[in-house]
């Protein structure tokens, strides 16, 4: 917990950093990410959870969407590209 921001850090067995996951408010998602969701086949789904993921190889937003009992997780980069 960093003030009001919750972060999870992942390290390998040798203690080297591998990943940071930062929980986000839905309102903190960039416009490009929101536009990608609205333009996708999941446009009618509700955003349930959002995280910002940082790794050695890249960064992306992990967005969990729900519609009834259906659930999907999308990886979206800062430009709005669904990975």
Predicted regions and their residues:
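Short coil turn/linker residues within repeat-based beta-strand modules
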Residues: 14-17, 76-81
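Aromatic side chains
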Residues: 11, 42-45, 61
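Exposed beta-strand-loop-beta-strand "reactive/processing" segments of non-cytosolic proteins
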Residues: 1-9, 51-75, 82
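Short, non-transmembrane alpha-helical segments in secretory-pathway proteins
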Residues: 24-49
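Short, surface-exposed linear patches
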Residues: 19-21, 32-33, 40-41, 68-70, ...
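Surface-exposed beta-strand edges and their flanking turn/coil or helix-capping segments
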Residues: 24, 32-35, 62-63, 75-78
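Acidic (E/D-rich), amphipathic helical modules within compact regulatory domains
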Residues: 1-24
